[in-house]
Amino acid sequence: MDTTLSPAVEAEQIADSTIDTVSRLIAGVFSGALTGIFAMAGAFTGAVTGAVAGRAAQYGVLRGAALGAVAGAILSVEVLEASRAYWYLELSGSRGPSSMADFVEQLFRGRLVDEQLMSTMINSHHWQLRISDVSYEEREDVYGELEARGLSGDSLRKLPCYIMSSEMVRRQVTHCTICLQDIKTGEITRSLPKCDHTFHLVCVDKWLIRHGSCPICRQAVKD
């Protein structure tokens, strides 16, 4: 039996394949552009906030703006990526009862000025005030210890995070050992890759910024 496709069918298949490829290319370009816009907007907002905080703390507007720009860009990209995951769950019907406002609030709560930005700035200002009292070698030891203590924003962004689905909740009893609350459907969580311990994203990120190890088993998150 001859299974050779007619020229018309072959042309139709080629056209469909071309349309699919072009559609994916356009979607990729749009996604990249949107991510860039979010990052730029977050960097600008963070830079303004950081500059104001830097002036108030008397350790430099430029340094505060630089720290704020980095933190703002990271936060904006995290919001965009998490929002995509949220809408995917919305379309698949596996989203929990939490609203979009609650969802975004989890990302913003304590992530920009209160934690990452202000904690870094205050520690920096504290050690700058005492810098004249120590030798060069002691300075290197102090700053090396502070740098190694917690994770950077880039390292945090590389750790896996996901939204707790109703199926995951049914499959396992999960609670956050940092805030001592159960992890509910629709909440954003982060799982540490080496030990697989899971926590609320906001809770564990606050911890990792200061410590860089698992709160339960104390295993280092990075090598």
Swiss-Prot record:
Organism the protein comes from: Arabidopsis thaliana
Transmembrane found in the keyword field: yes
Upregulation: Up-regulated by chitin.
GO MF annotations in UniProt: zinc ion binding
Primary subcellular site in the record, as a coarse category: membrane
Highest taxon above the source species: Eukaryota
Keywords: Membrane, Metal-binding, Plant defense, Transmembrane, Transmembrane helix, Zinc, Zinc-finger
Membrane topology label: Multi-pass membrane protein
Transmembrane segments: 25-45, 60-80, 93-113
Its job: May be involved in the early steps of the plant defense signaling pathway. Does not display E3 catalytic activity.
Keyword field contains Amino-acid biosynthesis: no
Localization per record: Membrane
Entry-linked CDD domains: RING-H2_NIPL1-like (cd23119)
Gene of this entry: ATL24
Similarity section: Belongs to the RING-type zinc finger family. NIP subfamily.
Annotated protein name in UniProt: NEP1-interacting protein-like 2
Gene Ontology cellular-component annotations: membrane
One annotated GO biological process: defense response
Zn finger spans (RING-type): 176-218
